[in-house]
Amino acid sequence: MSIRTPPRLLELAGRSLLRDQALAMSTLEELPTELFPPLFMEAFSRRRCEALKLMVQAWPFRRLPLRPLIKMPCLEAFQAVLDGLDALLTQGVHPRRWKLQVLDLQDVCENFWMVWSEAMAHGCFLNAKRNKKPVQDCPRMRGQQPLTVFVELWLKNRTLDEYLTCLLLWVKQRKDLLHLCCKKLKILGMPFRNIRSILKMVNLDCIQEVEVNCKWVLPILTQFTPYLGHMRNLQKLVLSHMDVSRYVSPEQKKEIVTQFTTQFLKLCCLQKLSMNSVSFLEGHLDQLLSCLKTSLKVLTITNCVLLESDLKHLSQCPSISQLKTLDLSGIRLTNYSLVPLQILLEKVAATLEYLDLDDCGIIDSQVNAILPALSRCFELNTFSFCGNPISMATLENLLSHTIILKNLCVELYPAPRESYDADGTLCWSRFPQIRAELMKRVRDLRHPKRILFCTDCCPDCGNRSFYDLEADQCCC
């Protein structure tokens, strides 16, 4: 039988304040700072709307991290917070202890509320003050508005959720009194007319990360393109499932791609570029690469169709010389010369830490072209080569070239062709012997930190089986 710790006197006093329907600002002016966070949480969860309005106006910190609290279904309480902010923004005289400058609705790992709750329980308010994180300001609008609202936009349904709808309507009516700062924008599915109305409310200069994954065709991309060009502080761009409509002529495609790629001339902070299943890149990668103004740290081009000329342009691009991550998985290279890939690896050898060449269809006759450059990537810590149909001899040769890469922590290689029957199914009677030979070869060469060999995708479940020292049959 557990014994509950009785509430502290301060805690009891604070709760009595919430029960007081006539709670006055003068009372809050004298309330100890350490009582505000736990009492605010209780007022929010109990929907004490009048108390919330007053507590927002007397909030003794520069920042109010509200996102963890609105995960509770309390739209009424959220509206009360906005009403309290209204009073701050419109009244001429502010409360004596007013400090609030930032309403933070970002979905980040935040222990503000937990720290102060534990402090209330244990009386360790000094530790709570020490554990406070510094306030994150928006450099774009410093000092121009009395309040900054940080928000992350995740547009995944046809309509906005009720909290975001409530917030955006409130912001729209007070746009001259506050600054709406969105650093992360994720578009996973919404009619573009709705997206457009939201983008018009946001200061595009503030956006640092954008992810678009909603099966757009080129005509829709053209509507998004002008907004992209205004995101001058964009650091990360992820595009996925962009298709060329069958109604778009080659001439129209070229014009649309040109309009899109020229926007990259304005993105002077871009460091991470990821494109997955983007069909318009075929034959046009040079247009995009020539418009890059910064040295990329991360480049991901996956499950796309590229021409051999696209690979050549990629190897010659000056903006990729400092890459830390290169992911070309799902790019079919079977019938291409890998000399451009060799040149590319030579360029990034001094900085490359992550290399993914899964499912590129690389065969025995192509591997030798990249081995000298690969063996000079001394910073490489992760290398994945699954899904490439190479023989046992070629795999052993590959392993002998990666032996000198001392920073390699994770290595993934395909099961050699000898592991399969003529119809392409894994031969479980032959496979254990091949695995044993491979592991012996690896141990003779070095002591890997983490090395896995993987099968082709199972025709029944679609998954790969990974194995190291033990070979387990597919779970299906």
UniProtKB/Swiss-Prot annotation:
What keywords were assigned to this record?
A: Leucine-rich repeat, Repeat
Q: Which domain of life is it from?
A: Eukaryota
An example Gene Ontology cellular component term from the record? cytoplasm
Write out the GO MF terms: ubiquitin-like ligase-substrate adaptor activity
State if Repeat is listed as a keyword.
Answer: yes
BP terms from Gene Ontology: negative regulation of apoptotic process; negative regulation of cell differentiation; negative regulation of DNA-templated transcription; positive regulation of cell population proliferation; proteasome-mediated ubiquitin-dependent protein catabolic process
Residue ranges of the LRR repeats are 97-124, 179-203, 204-230, 231-266, 267-292, 293-324, 325-345, 349-376, 377-401
Q: Which PANTHER family match?
A: PRAME FAMILY MEMBER 11-RELATED, SIMILAR TO PREFERENTIALLY EXPRESSED ANTIGEN IN MELANOMA-LIKE 3
Indicate the family of this protein: Belongs to the PRAME family.
What is the recorded name of this protein?
PRAME family member 5
Native source species: Homo sapiens (Human)
Organismal lineage: Eukaryota, Metazoa, Chordata, Craniata, Vertebrata
Q: Which gene encodes it?
A: PRAMEF5
